[in-house]
């Protein structure tokens, strides 16, 4: 759903240039949610996340995916011009930007006022960034998503 929403955020006058998706399903148990079936007749839900391991393995997957994205998109040094990342929090943002050698001023964030809103955070953040003039015509924008499972998507959009 997050990838679908990200594609819908790309307006008619913007062009999807391509992308790369990778997964690391061996880490699928790091974030688990759903009905707690251990209770007879219960409809309670449970959620468990090993946030330290999600960050560690997510960043490793993110680095590999970004490396492949840069190669597949034939990105010039210094590209993408702007980035919109999955919005989790300050620690995750700082860690992934440092790991990818991306300067923080290229990233637009919303987690400080919207919080972690899951799979819709990337398209909502892109819409707000566009509305506020952060994304400019001609920018090569990298949409960078990492989610539990672990799954990683990198899209290149000509703004």
What do these predicted ranges mean?
Residues 6-7, 69, 73, 129:
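Hydrophobic helix-cap positions at the C-terminus of alpha-helices
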Residues 59-66, 77, 81-159:
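Claisen-condensing/thiolase-fold acyl-transfer catalytic domains that form or cleave C-C bonds
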Residues 38, 72-75:
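Short, conserved, surface-exposed binding loops centered on an aromatic residue
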């Amino acid at each position: 759903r997050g990838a679908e929403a990200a594609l819908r955020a790309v307006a008619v006058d913007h062009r999807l240039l391509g992308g790369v998706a990778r997964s690391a399903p061996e880490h699928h148990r790091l974030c688990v949610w759903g009905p707690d079936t251990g209770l007879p007749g219960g409809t309670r839900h449970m959620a468990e996340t090993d946030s330290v391991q999600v960050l560690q393995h997510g960043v490793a997957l993110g680095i590999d995916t970004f490396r492949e994205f840069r190669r597949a998109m034939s990105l010039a040094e210094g590209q993408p011009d702007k980035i919109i990342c999955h919005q989790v929090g300050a620690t995750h943002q700082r860690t992934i930007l440092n790991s990818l050698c991306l300067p923080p001023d290229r990233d637009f964030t919303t987690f400080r006022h919207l919080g972690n809103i899951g799979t819709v955070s990337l398209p909502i953040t892109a819409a707000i960034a566009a509305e506020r003039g952060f994304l400019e015509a001609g920018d090569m924008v990298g949409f960078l998503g990492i989610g539990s499972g672990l799954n990683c998507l990198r899209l290149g959009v000509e703004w």
